[in-house]
Curated annotation (Swiss-Prot):
The gene is cdhB1. SUPFAM superfamilies: DHS-like NAD/FAD-binding domain. Pfam families: CO_dh. Part of a complex that catalyzes the reversible cleavage of acetyl-CoA, allowing growth on acetate as sole source of carbon and energy. The alpha-epsilon subcomponent functions as a carbon monoxide dehydrogenase. The precise role of the epsilon subunit is unclear; it may have a stabilizing role within the alpha(2)epsilon(2) component and/or be involved in electron transfer to FAD during a potential FAD-mediated CO oxidation. Keywords: Methanogenesis. This is Acetyl-CoA decarbonylase/synthase complex subunit epsilon 1.
Length: 170
């Protein structure tokens, strides 16, 4: 019988790359060290508990918000720096190093995503993963494999606790 399990050294650099799981502590450090972070939020942030945490993250770390879908309406009276943009267009713009950003001060180095359906945000982050050096951190309830780093699959209670821990560490 031929042993086909030996010599498993890789000689290529291609293949599927997936995100690394991240703890709230590490995510907070990465967000704090980012030169130009952007918080990208989706329509799932219409949930009042999640919306409250989005506002706290933005205010605590002084991060502008890219509001996608119908999320801008809920942020209008929260005294945060939020701009509307289509999520797919933002994903496209983030791959362009010459894009001026939402505020005209240049492209971002780190994008934090929260409040999206898993199948949707994975498609948006696919371009950023494959065509840019952008660091993306998914602080979603589900594991997002096209992000650079992501929380694992969490229950709703654990997700809220992880977000609270992240806010405390920012």
């Amino acid at each position: 019988m031929v042993d086909t399990a030996k010599n498993t050294k890789l000689f290529t650099s291609y293949g599927v790359s997936t995100s690394k799981t991240v703890t709230p502590e590490i995510a907070a450090k990465l967000i704090s060290k980012a030169k130009r972070p952007l918080l990208m939020v989706g329509t799932l942030t219409l949930d009042p508990e999640l919306l409250d945490r989005v506002v706290k993250i933005s205010k605590t770390a002084n991060i502008p918000i890219a509001a996608t879908g119908s999320s801008l309406a809920s942020l209008a009276d929260k005294d945060v720096d939020a701009e509307y943009i289509n999520a797919h267009m933002l994903g496209f713009y983030l791959t362009d190093p010459n894009w001026p950003g939402l505020d005209g001060n240049g492209n971002y180095d780190t994008v934090i995503v929260l409040g999206f359906k898993k199948f949707y945000i994975n498609q948006v982050l696919s371009a950023a993963k494959n065509f840019s050096n952008l660091k993306t951190i998914a602080i979603e309830r589900g594991y997002i494999q096209n992000a650079t780093m992501s929380f694992g699959n969490l229950s709703k209670a654990d997700h809220y606790a992880a977000l609270d821990e992240l806010i405390d560490l920012l």
